[in-house]
Amino acid sequence: MDITIVNHPLVASRLTLMRDERSDNAAFRAAASDLGAMLIYEASRDLAVEHFDTQTPVAVAEGTRLEKPPIIVPIIRAGLGMIDPALSMIPDAQVGFIGLARDEETHEPVPYLEALPEDLSDQPVFLVDPMLATGGSLLHAIRLLAERGATDITAICMVSAQPGVDALKNSGLPCRLVTAAIDPELNEDAYIVPGLGDAGDRLYGPRNIEL
């Protein structure tokens, strides 16, 4: 499996802001937006392109555009924070959705939403989720995509844990990984260590809010 760890000073600085427990929701979202755009940029490096003539104010120049823009598929909830940076880089991309919640006792994914094209064959797919922990949610999502014919799947995660990376490697599923960091372990609650906490809560606040 192809794994790209994006080693860049700006990537590292935004990831540091996201890790910092002092970063409030607004600061975390801003750093996530910047980092998301950088990871999408890197993930797009090998996308197929086509060339055409374009007229400048002076002469004709060779233009370039994506041959087939990828479909962006966030894993809800935390993956929603990566849609805007993805679309800022690839504005003509389509967006699909996979909704998965985590069972806090078993740490297994619980599906609740699936909004995807029926046929994903010959279609690049960018599967976005800020965190790859156990790999359960990501593997479930990849299987859903593969069932629809997807063979060109790139998982884009801000922070990955080594156990989740190993699970992805051993799955045999058609996927490559682009990430800003691979952290060494998970704690007993299946949180990435050192990680950055609960990405969904840090983006949007706690799931259950008493009014």
From Swiss-Prot:
Residues annotated to bind 5-phospho-alpha-D-ribose 1-diphosphate: R77, R102, D129, P130, M131, L132, A133, T134, G135, G136, S137, D198
Cofactor(s), by name: Mg(2+)
Zinc among keywords: no
Alphabetical UniProt keywords: Allosteric enzyme, Glycosyltransferase, GTP-binding, Magnesium, Nucleotide-binding, Transferase
Annotated GO MF terms: GTP binding; magnesium ion binding; uracil phosphoribosyltransferase activity
Keyword Cytoplasm: no
Gene3D superfamilies reported in the protein's UniProt record: 3.40.50.2020
EC number: 2.4.2.9
SUPFAM superfamilies given in the database record: PRTase-like (SSF53271)
Pathway: Pyrimidine metabolism; UMP biosynthesis via salvage pathway; UMP from uracil: step 1/1
An individual GO BP term: UMP salvage
Positions contributing to uracil binding: I192, G197, D198, A199
Family matches, as Pfam families: UPRTase
UniProt remark on cofactor binding: Binds 1 Mg(2+) ion per subunit. The magnesium is bound as Mg-PRPP.
The reaction(s) this protein catalyses: UMP + diphosphate = 5-phospho-alpha-D-ribose 1-diphosphate + uracil
Activity modulation: Allosterically activated by GTP.
Role played: Catalyzes the conversion of uracil and 5-phospho-alpha-D-ribose 1-diphosphate (PRPP) to UMP and diphosphate.
Protein family membership: Belongs to the UPRTase family.
The protein's name in its UniProt record: Uracil phosphoribosyltransferase
Organism encoding this protein: Corynebacterium efficiens (strain DSM 44549 / YS-314 / AJ 12310 / JCM 11189 / NBRC 100395)
